């Protein structure tokens, strides 16, 4: 614990930016990083991890520090607790592999427990024979006191990587000797280093995020080049803008053009314009941006040396992807399966059961590593943001007095932009989560609620002040960025900017499923763009708009045609029609470009409008049917968004307008992004800061602790037992907190009523919790209120059940073949099943509704990569469940579990 506190105190802003406390540089001082000079020696390794050895006759008596990184707070479970038994370790030696030795035998010693287990990927790792004295096994990596064989290293004890020079050189040595002034070091080969790093990962969230980032970035070269290009674009925009503003003598250009004298760019450039013409404020701004670029370059250097190289070796030697080009074609599921095959070679994830009895309790809290758990770790923070947006915890709408027409455009759907989204995530993530990716312990304690709310509100206000100060510079930068980026596209295809649509940032969070990785989500949205455009184009536009566009298209086309023909006819050596000024300082080329652009825009709009007419239906290769309802249902197969409020109105213009708020014009999104740079400070100060208390309540109430995984968002675990926390429409409307006493009394009433109605206990709990949170009238006051409340419960529950949709989609994308087939069968049964009748919780009547989740989703087959997480009937820890009978559950149980874990630290 003292070691962890010391590391926490040394943690600074720059250390976190540059990754100085990363999992890749938590090694000893004597550890030598990977050197590319030893690549040529891989031919001597013969496919093994350690196929050669280093001979020596003596050893060094060095004093090693007792550093134990496994005791750090890595995953907020009992495996990282100091009170838990010591974790087993394996010595890392360099003796030559013995082919006749049984590599599957595990040897134990009472003085230093360790374990080892073979895997298909590293079958060449042998094990040590049993020794009476294993005190110095950590030193046997280089110092060979006894014959030893290769095994996997663990980080429980410090290891010595130095040795005195041998008497004679050995041709079998795979460690490259480095000459130093006073000592010699040996470089570990890449494959051994990859194994060592994987065996000693202490922050699994950071490592898996880096693995996914490397996969999504298509390798180290593409990641480095992409980040360099971004910095070059920033530097080009700054330098080119300053050059155009203060580096060219435009007065001399205008005077020389009237004299018809030949002028070159060299004549127009002002010498020493940076020191003489550029204002001091602009120089300070350029200095600040230059410092930012330097920091980004330093960060890229650290990431390249300490992250990207290590991840590349990990993919190459352990995942089995020697070439980064294969990352563009390989599926993420294949990488997940290969990661799971390596779990027995990591001290946090090993599930070896052939261990002595004293280690059984320690193995119960091992880090979980399957497809669901990997997605939960990568999406730990994003899952909370998805739930925040879907439950409408954040109030982002603005209301300007005396401007009611403008207020309709300043709703949550239009105000939430990339800039505001980045500021909100920056304030929340750095406040809620610690450096290990886990939720801070004080956030989960109820008595800290008011203090945390004030601190988070102060963070939002500080971010508002910073955005207000940087607003002028950021606005100029983004205007230039969008102009340079989209002008060429607009010039080649004018309709690409004014006619194309894309999903808004608010829609991206609204449509995203829990545990859905970014590349799956982007693919799903891209598949929906075509059907969404077809659905919108089926609705006819206003008659005024259509006729006006026809007139403008005809007039602009006629004028453009006449100007082009006149230029071709009258242009010769004596007369230059293209430079003829139709108006003052406006030549014919200017008007040809202007009217040609108008004609292209109106033509593309009319083409999309008239593409569904009877004249064009016969010319289309594929059959087309005018059916907006069927088109929207087809779009919902990709967006997974079809609220029950749209039922019976899918063909109406109102539903189409609501869908267009999600799928908006691209030019409108760009304008909103620019306006957001001005509105973000006011939204952060007046709106988001007022939601600080609701944000703290959300993280406390919807965070559950999973043994071996830590605290995660409730909805990401796909737990269908507690329906009161599911995505209901009525819960989104509740903003105030209910006292715990009334909630506890409601639970007691619900439990007393459940004795006579055991078949209806789940819906009864839903009704009681919903009545408390929504502050509805008590169901026992009158029979009329019972009927209304029960009807609302069923309608709200089945209106937008996002957690169930996320569960089904996760099975389709990340499950095995059997799981995918099971999910497709159940989804087809759900679509084909007629509405069933569900019993009301408070009476014997029934209402029409959809089947419950327990009927929709069947248990998955065993022996699959997702069996432990995707089966809703799966128990995470059977031994812990047996020992915890009679314990409290729900919120009180979660708090009790948290305090127990907090004491064990």
UniProtKB/Swiss-Prot annotation:
Extent of Basic and acidic residues compositional bias: 94-117
Membrane-crossing residue ranges in chain numbering: 228-248, 273-293, 550-570, 589-609
Gene Ontology CC annotation, any one: endoplasmic reticulum membrane
Ranges of Polar residues composition bias in the record: 823-835
Locations listed in the record: Preautophagosomal structure membrane; Cytoplasmic vesicle membrane; Golgi apparatus membrane; Endoplasmic reticulum membrane
Bias type Low complexity, positions: 60-84
Keyword annotations from UniProtKB, A to Z: Autophagy, Cytoplasmic vesicle, Endoplasmic reticulum, Golgi apparatus, Lipid transport, Membrane, Phosphoprotein, Transmembrane, Transmembrane helix, Transport
Region (Disordered): 55-132, 731-795, 821-851
Membrane topology term: Multi-pass membrane protein
PANTHER family, sorted: APG9 AUTOPHAGY 9 (PTHR13038), AUTOPHAGY-RELATED PROTEIN 9 (PTHR13038:SF10)
Domain notes: Forms a homotrimer with a solvated central pore, which is connected laterally to the cytosol through the cavity within each protomer. Acts as a lipid scramblase that uses its central pore to function: the central pore opens laterally to accommodate lipid headgroups, thereby enabling lipid flipping and redistribution of lipids added to the outer leaflet of ATG9-containing vesicles, thereby enabling growth into autophagosomes.
UniProt similarity note: Belongs to the ATG9 family.
Function: Phospholipid scramblase involved in autophagy and cytoplasm to vacuole transport (Cvt) vesicle formation. Cycles between the preautophagosomal structure/phagophore assembly site (PAS) and the cytoplasmic vesicle pool and supplies membrane for the growing autophagosome. Lipid scramblase activity plays a key role in preautophagosomal structure/phagophore assembly by distributing the phospholipids that arrive through ATG2 from the cytoplasmic to the luminal leaflet of the bilayer, thereby driving autophagosomal membrane expansion. Required for mitophagy.
Description of how the protein assembles with itself and partners: Homotrimer; forms a homotrimer with a central pore that forms a path between the two membrane leaflets.
Protein's UniProt name: Autophagy-related protein 9
Species this protein is from: Debaryomyces hansenii (strain ATCC 36239 / CBS 767 / BCRC 21394 / JCM 1990 / NBRC 0083 / IGC 2968) (Yeast)
Gene: ATG9
